[in-house]
Amino acid sequence: MKLRVSQSPTPQMVITMLHGSSTYSLLASKKRNSNVVGQYIKNGIPFRMRNPADPSQPQVILPFKYLSEMKNAAESSWSFMHFSNQSFLLEYINAPLGSSIAHQVVRGELNKNLDWTALQPYMLFANTIARTTSLVLAGPELSANPEWTTIMVTFTMTLMQTSQEVRAKYSPWLRWLVPWIHPGAKNLYKIRKRCAQLLAPSYQNRRAGMVGDEKPFMDAIQWLMNKRTYKSKDLMKLSDDQLFLSVASIHSTSASTLSTLYDLLDRPECMDGILHEIRTIRAESKSSDWTKHDLDRLVKLDSFMKESQRYHPVGQVTVQRSNPRAYEFSDGLKIPANTQTCFLSYELNHDPDVYPDPETFDADRFLRMREKVDPQKYHFAYVSEDSINFGAGAHSCPGRHFAANEIKLMLCELLLGYEMKWPDGQSRPPTMFHDFSSNPNPGFDICIRERRL
């Protein structure tokens, strides 16, 4: 379907709506307009698509020439929090609203069978990451509590399901009723209240330690309490910060781990080389446990992870923002207030001017770039204007270094302890696309058995 182009002598033009974008699927719209999307991005022209969160306010896809200005803009001009509230209807469904304090805390403080067995590994990853993340964010007491771990794993899915139901069933002018009448919204409030109850003993322990001479706890509860004064009567604010951090970490890290594993299973020759690297570093390590230095030395694994992220990104768009007030870019492009904007991940990840031979999965691509250009750049958690899978600017993922180490640890333990392969005749399943998201399909088995010495 052809695209009508609005011509204007200045960038203050009416941004063109992509024809055929009445569907909620970004993938479907891009397929219908595959040539023009590429031309718009290449020529630096913004365009609009239907917004799944609010069809009355189309989503603006910005060309990459605006990325530098966007990432350096003040929160009052371009806000990820404002985008999240709009996109997931957080204020209508009794969901926790993310705070800048929680963001600062993560950025500043954290950074046996012999036979083959069929296994769907996603929930294994999710539960492992939930416990690991909870140990760091909530401390040893709550990370060992099965109820807390279950809430951390299921809360995101409950929130997303409720958001989708409210978006589909309630017009914008009726959404103010949702917190009181929608079962999902009422359930989210109950979960938040239960989290506050579970958190209370940990809060009291840390509060007592802050008064006395006890050594401070090294977890996000302590870090949050250092940044903000919480009172017993409003512990839900503290638990909301915990839930917000879990929403931002557990399932995205689990999906990235699953996607990397799928790509490893498709390339057993890479798996063998990475296993050799892991064994070598473990043999040379002076510690019985993994150290950060050991993990940093896993350069082949790190390069494979980043190439997997480039080739199969978790998400079709990135650097998602919304502007609380009208904004004018330096070249004169004017964006009305409350406009949701983003940048396309695939187009940058597959740009031959940035990544030569982009349609080829090159496991050592980023290892060579580190060796030839800068060993401190191009690692998995690295962000730049050429690498935006973790976002850009002030709201690039603050926990990406922690997530990188979680993924490495899980893959190392799997590769050291188990042999893995696809069932006969199977390879990586097609990626799941919905709205602007893309995720590896978790509903497929892999074959696994204990590694024989």
UniProtKB/Swiss-Prot annotation:
User: What residues form the membrane-spanning segments?
Assistant: 13-29
Cellular location(s): Membrane
Using the record, list the residue span of the signal peptide; answer none if the entry has no such feature: none
Q: Which residues are glycosylated?
A: N85
Q: Could you say which residues bind heme here? A: C397
Q: Which cofactors go with this protein? A: heme
Metal-binding as UniProt keyword: yes
Q: Which domain of life is it from?
A: Eukaryota
The job of this chain, per UniProt, is described as: Cytochrome P450 monooxygenase; part of the gene cluster that mediates the biosynthesis of a tyrosine-derived cytochalasan acting as a fungal signal recognized by resistant rice plants and leads to avirulence in Pi33 resistant rice cultivars. The first step in the pathway is catalyzed by the hybrid PKS-NRPS ACE1, assisted by the enoyl reductase RAP1, that are responsible for fusion of the tyrosine precursor and the polyketide backbone.
The family assignment reads:
Belongs to the cytochrome P450 family.
Query: What's the name of the protein?
Result: Cytochrome P450 monooxygenase CYP2
Species per Swiss-Prot/TrEMBL record: Pyricularia oryzae (strain 70-15 / ATCC MYA-4617 / FGSC 8958) (Rice blast fungus)
